Amino acid sequence: MQDWIAQTARARAWFESLRDRICAEFENIEAEAGSAAKFDYTSWHREEAGNPNPGGGTRGVMKGQVLEKVGVNVSTVHGTFAPEFAATIHGAGAENPGFTATGISLVAHMANPHVPAVHMNTRFLTTSKAWFGGGGDLNPPIPYPQDTAEFHAAFQAACDAHGADYYDRFKAWADDYFFIPHRGVHRGVGGIFYDHLDCDGDTAFEANFAFTRDVGEAFLDIFPKLVRRRMGTAFTAADKAQQLEWRGRYAEFNLVYDRGTLFGLKTGGNVDAILMSLPPEATWS
């Protein structure tokens, strides 16, 4: 019989390990720029009436000279969906409202407009089903074709190792998902997005867990390279203004359309951790 409790524990351990490695690398980048910035970690605990073990997480935030604001949240929560929300969740519903979710979510907003902002998250959920989801997308205020191509190539390599059609499917899903309908524009230059990689049996779990780990490794490999390439580029006041207006679009997407934001708010998550994706400053013209 499949042991979802043990599998959740393994996924959680991986997400925490990935968090530690990413945060260490971001602190290294700050040190290279002459900054002493470090992550500040805050633990939080979820509350749910009648639930003795609702779970919680740890939110890490750093405000540096290169990474103006970066937030990394790792959480593991257990509970029961409200009936109307349960109906929207894979494998849930009125007869199966219980869930467990563990995952890592990261958003980095950069001080230099030439350095792309970025989002990455991966997660493992169980309802009456168990599945992995996640992805990452690059969000440059000033796009560079080289950066875009290398970011996509890193995720394509991760996808190709696990499924011949994965990259095309998950890139198209990202293009559809990271779109701002009321603006008629994409949030950034894309990446990959996947969900509902069902783990019906131990073999499927191991395969999808391996893919999810490779997505995390791809991010950890490529994004610091892009930051180091652009962080010393001189920028103008016009460049900064372009960045701040673009950040407004990013905030609109996350507050109106983002699934993770909705899931966190609907399941009693930590509000500060949920909204850590918002930029430190933005403008609207």
Model-based region annotation:
Residues 158-211, 225-228:
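Long, charged, mostly alpha-helical binding arms that flank functional sites
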Residues 3-90, 200-256:
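Gly/Pro-rich turn-and-neighbor structural signature
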Residues 83-85, 115-117, 144-147, 263-265:
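Short helix/loop capping segments that flank catalytic or ligand/cofactor-binding pockets
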Residues 56-134:
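Internal mixed beta-strand/loop scaffold within catalytic domains of large alpha/beta enzymes
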Residues 7, 110-112, 126-128, 138-144, ...:
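A generic structural motif
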Residues 261-285:
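Long, contiguous binding/interaction regions
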